């Protein structure tokens, strides 16, 4: 996803 903690890696 977008901006998070673990979500940040899969922009």
From Swiss-Prot:
Going by the UniProt record, its keywords in alphabetical order are: Amidation, Neuropeptide, Secreted
Please cite one Gene Ontology biological process associated with this protein: neuropeptide signaling pathway
**Sites of Leucine amide modification:** 11
Does the record carry Secreted as a key word?
yes
Primary location class: secreted
In terms of superkingdom, the source organism counts as Eukaryota
Q: Where is this chain's protein located in or outside the cell?
A: Secreted
Cellular component (GO) terms are: extracellular region
What the protein does? FMRFamides and FMRFamide-like peptides are neuropeptides.
Q: Which family does it belong to?
A: Belongs to the FARP (FMRF amide related peptide) family.
Name listed for the protein in its UniProt record: Extended FMRFamide-9
**Originating species:** Mantophasma kudubergense (Gladiator)
